[in-house]
Curated annotation (Swiss-Prot):
Ranges for region ARC ATPase binding: 21-56
Source taxonomy: Bacteria, Bacillati, Actinomycetota, Actinomycetes, Micrococcales
Keywords: Isopeptide bond, Ubl conjugation pathway
The name this protein goes by in its record: Prokaryotic ubiquitin-like protein Pup
Organism: Brachybacterium faecium (strain ATCC 43885 / DSM 4810 / JCM 11609 / LMG 19847 / NBRC 14762 / NCIMB 9860 / 6-10)
UniProt PTM: Is modified by deamidation of its C-terminal glutamine to glutamate by the deamidase Dop, a prerequisite to the subsequent pupylation process.
Amino acid sequence: MSQQSLNAPGPGAEDGNDPEAVTGGQTFASAQAADDLLDEIDSVLESNAETFVRSFVQKGGQ
């Protein structure tokens, strides 16, 4: 998802003077945190994918 679509004003935000309007800054921060987490997972997978996968697989394949 692009930053433009995350921070685009919603319907009814024509004049920008609505005191209850949400700016989308928190949404961008959440998206950035998710991107950082995915980058960390990618780096772990690149270095040791087998151990990463085994940590999620229980005995018996469950």
